[in-house]
């Protein structure tokens, strides 16, 4: 069942996604998240962030981009970070700790 979801981008996400994906590729991801908001894998140690694969260019999802997002409520998703898999495999412990602080702030704002 579809329902309305508000997507909010961090400034970091906006900068990163512009470098790696087209508007249509981003729209395709947002449609996937509307269909299944909890689609991404939970990232341990981040306070609830999820990581999802995103197809970009002529690459499939497996070797393409990664998007980190936070499902704050059933109808609000924060888009936090994005990167090409070829440039980064996963988050470092320091990044996870910083992102956990962010998720705590976002939870407090609900």
Across the structure, where does each feature detected by a protein language model lie?
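Arg/Lys-rich, positively charged N-terminal/basic patches that mediate binding to nucleic acids
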Residues: 1-24
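Amphipathic alpha-helical interface surfaces
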Residues: 9, 25-29, 64, 76, ...
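Compact soluble domain cores
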Residues: 12, 21-41
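Residues that form generic nucleotide/phosphate-binding pockets
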Residues: 16, 32, 102-105
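Basic/aromatic recognition patch in beta-strand/loop cores that engages polyanionic ligands
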Residues: 42-83, 87
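Enriched for short, Lys/Arg-rich terminal
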Residues: 70-110
């Amino acid at each position: 069942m579809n329902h309305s979801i508000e997507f909010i981008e961090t400034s970091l996400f906006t900068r990163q996604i512009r470098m790696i994906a087209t508007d249509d590729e981003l729209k395709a991801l947002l449609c996937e998240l509307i269909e299944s908001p909890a689609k991404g894998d939970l990232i341990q140690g981040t306070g609830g962030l999820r990581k999802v694969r995103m197809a970009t260019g002529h690459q499939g999802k497996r070797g393409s981009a990664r998007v980190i997002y936070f499902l704050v409520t059933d109808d609000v998703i924060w888009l936090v970070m994005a990167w090409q898999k070829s440039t980064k495999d996963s988050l470092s412990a320091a990044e996870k700790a910083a992102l956990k602080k962010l998720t705590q702030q976002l939870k407090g704002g609900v």
